Amino acid sequence: MSTVTWGKKRKRSGGDSKAKSRGSSSYIPRSVSSRRESLQVATFSWTSSGSGIKFSPGGAAYLVSNFPQGANDNCRHTNKTVLYKFMAKNTIYLDSSHYMKVFRAPFHFWLVYDKSPGANVPSTGDIFEGPSLFPHNPWTWTVSRAACHRFVVKKTWSCVVESNGIDPTKGQGATYYGPGPCNQVKSCNKFFKRLGVSTEWKNSATGDVGDIKEGALYIVGAPSQKSDVYVNGYFRVYFKSVGNQ
């Protein structure tokens, strides 16, 4: 019976071991990752008292990129800001004059970028083609051809409020068999990222639209169905100060 003989282990030469040691000890330098600077935060409410603001047919626009000059977190530190994120936590409710009606009223929002803002916040008629002809149908509005090089709609969303003919502030008797509750009050929350709205500022201390050299952001709201609607709550923006001081 023949025996199986296994091959002998090959002895490594000194050159092989040195080459392996050189390969194992090779160092690949890595770049040092710098920590990204935190975004600044500014929070706004619709009114200083916390009450709701009334929107009537035709709608209205309000400045979002409102950053006065200063050292606080909600202020601009340089002559340029970039707005990245937007959060809205709002409550929408009908004016009490519409409680006796039976209808549904969609409410529309837009985030609109203005490349060349003026001394005042523009009206919806300055931005859109439609408010004069269709003031009660804001879903038909679009940026006018004459202003398309100035205004850009970044985001849009809507929320529906309703009325069932019953005043919700009054109690009903034991024999009431009318309609049930409806969305006379509706919450409407939104969060948008990657907006990238760049704003260049004049050498001034305040943060109004007249202080902006280029690039403003507005929130625009408009009710439908000949209704008057209140919007209550707040919105928050996340931005960064860039450029020179």
UniProtKB/Swiss-Prot annotation:
Alphabetical UniProt keywords: Capsid protein, DNA-binding, Host nucleus, T=1 icosahedral capsid protein, Viral penetration into host nucleus, Virion, Virus entry into host cell
Bias type Low complexity, positions: 22-31
Subcellular location: Virion; Host nucleus
Ranges for region Disordered: 1-31
GO cellular component, one term: host cell
Keyword DNA-binding found: yes
Main localization, broad class: virion
Residue ranges of the motif Bipartite nuclear localization signal: 5-31
Domain of life of the source: Viruses
InterPro entries: Gemcoat_MSV, GV_A/BR1_coat, Viral_coat
Listed GO MF terms: DNA binding; structural molecule activity
One GO term of the biological process aspect: symbiont entry into host cell
Role according to the record: Encapsidates the viral genome into characteristic twinned ('geminate') particles. Binds the genomic viral ssDNA and shuttles it into and out of the cell nucleus. Plays a role in protection of the genome from degradation, virus acquisition and transmission by insect vectors, infectivity, and systemic movement. The CP of monopartite geminiviruses is absolutely essential for virus movement.
Similarity comment: Belongs to the geminiviridae capsid protein family.
Subunit structure: Homomultimer. Interacts with the movement protein. Binds to single-stranded and double-stranded viral DNA.
Name of the protein in its database record: Capsid protein
Species of provenance: Bean yellow dwarf virus
